[in-house]
Amino acid sequence: MKKKNISFIEKIDRIISGGVSKQLISFFIFTGLVVLGFMLVSLLFGEDVTFYGDEQMYGNARIDRMAGLLYHFMDSGNLSKTAGSGFGVQLFVFLFTFAGMVLLGGLLITTLTNIVDRRVSDIEEGNVVYSKMENHNVIIGYGDVTINIIRTLFGITGGRDAKDGKDITGQEETLSPILILTSQDVKKVRAELFAQLPEKYEQFIYFYSGNIDSYEHIKSLNIHSAKEVFVLGENSEYGRDSKNLECVKTIAKLRGTGKEILTVNVQFDKLTSYSTIQKISLSDEFRASDGKRSIYFRPFNFYENWARLLWGFNGNIGNKYDRLDYREMEEDMYVHLVIVGFNSMGRALLLEALRQCHYPNFVEGGKDGKKEVKTRITVVDKEMKDMLPEFLAQYPYLNQIKDIEIKYVNGKVQDPKVRNLLIEETENWNALLTVAICLEDPDLSLSTGLCLPDKVFYKIEDNKIQHTDTRVLIRQALVQEGIGQLLESDNDKYSKVHIFGMTDKGVCRELMNDDFAMYVNAYYTILYYDCKNPDAKHKIIEDYNKHIANLIAADPGLADNNFIDWVIMPEHKKFMHETAKQLWLFLNEDMRFANRYQIDMFGTYAKYINSPMLMQMEHLRWNADRSIVGYLSSADSGIKDANYKLHKSIIPFNALSEKEQKKDEDVIENMKKLMSTLPTPSKS
């Protein structure tokens, strides 16, 4: 290829806009040429001519001449030294001195200023890369939940000027920095984030400008030495979920093996994408270049996170939201959840309720003359007629969930039919009603929630105003601290109203913690592992068995301990945790023996700990979870196939074999042991 001819102006532009080294080298070369040129011209003068008066500096005439010229070049005040010399000498020295003034006093200062300005500009625009950064947290993409993740990583609970933020005095050197890669305007992103953070944390946040689908940009994040990664993608970016998934594959290659497995938390914006990821096997995609596992792929969805914050065990610890069964369930009582708005948030709440709402007063088949008291869920949306076919195509087997009735209403919550339903259920003592307003527009959602029928909020009996038990949840997608505080402090009409869905509270460590699920999975993996058909887990389980054999040899009284018994013993937890973690990584999300949804039921199980129906409740939960994932009951054929999502155990609890019922019993026993290490989180 013929080399392009570059004009002089273009060369100058490249130098000016180049890096620090390029500008400095160009300056010194040009300055050196100017000095050399004047030195050569000085040879035209006679040897008896001096440029620095008669003062002898080095005892050598030639060196004194050169030194005198350099002194003039560096200091214009030395011009007086040429007094008495001829006009030609004075003019020559003046020109040389002037060149020094221009180059050293002008061009050098300009070059250094330009370098500093460029550096500042590059930092502000995210163009500066720090190659030695390590033990840092990485956030790829900028979106609504970014500030929430930063607050979580730093342990911040208040606003920018809050005094309840984590005290980092003396911890500056140990606090892990956060590196954010975004394709958005870095200046704007920095301003938005810093406006919501205490000032003392700003020094620990770094910004890179780049694209999520660029290998070089991801490589610049020092993935090989990172502590944890969050892949969020950019807000409203086309193909966001697909790009996030592709980015994870790049991270797996860059991480390499021989290091601690890196946790990569990946946000999937659409519930459909999130559900698909949970159904398919991705194990081979997320390995290092040598084929070994290098990362722990941890998908999450903002809307599901909020549903779990409302009602799940981990999310509900210590928060303000009441359970759906906010009273003790008696024989004829039932939970009734009304969801207004069938958008992503509404669907997430529906799916979470389907996993959670399994109670001891449901009797399969009306056994012993008792009723089949089912949970009721009503979903209201004015576009339901168009939205429902798509939803049922995505979740085709929800009709396998036998203890929950779902009703889809094409209309508005303002319709007389819906308003009358809310009043009737509020007045029905057996109905535990919760209304969740999930509209996307914060103002519309607020006005809709506060304009429900008055009888939903209070009643008048014996000439006295009494609050009803109905709970009302109002989605506020934006950060609405002011409105939230007003509602929280209201002890009158709106005392049972709470806001939810805020973007600054959608992610927390409790929600992302899979330890309990990991331990339960390890329990079943070890219990049912077939040593006659060894696979990739064989070495892990073999090491575990050897370790346990040594412990039992030292103390035979521990011979009956199972994995859960060992893991709750502080002196053995480290080894057991590592074993559970390795086994957890070998299986895809929906192939594990336990998951976060099972743990989310622990609060409900704890509330009804003395009920003989706990095992049935666990099986009903499992049926619901498998149905949501996409498993079809194959009880008639007896086929069990994970690839085709067929399972023969999606049947009533009483129809299960004794062996299968024992699995549900084990879940309850394991729950009791694991929860013995924690304060009981159940709420009445």
Segments from the language model and where they lie:
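C-terminal non-catalytic accessory extensions
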Residues: 664-672
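Short interaction-hotspot residues at assembly and binding interfaces
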Residues: 641-649
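Cytosolic regulatory regions of ion transport systems
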Residues: 1-35, 44, 48-62, 77-621, ...
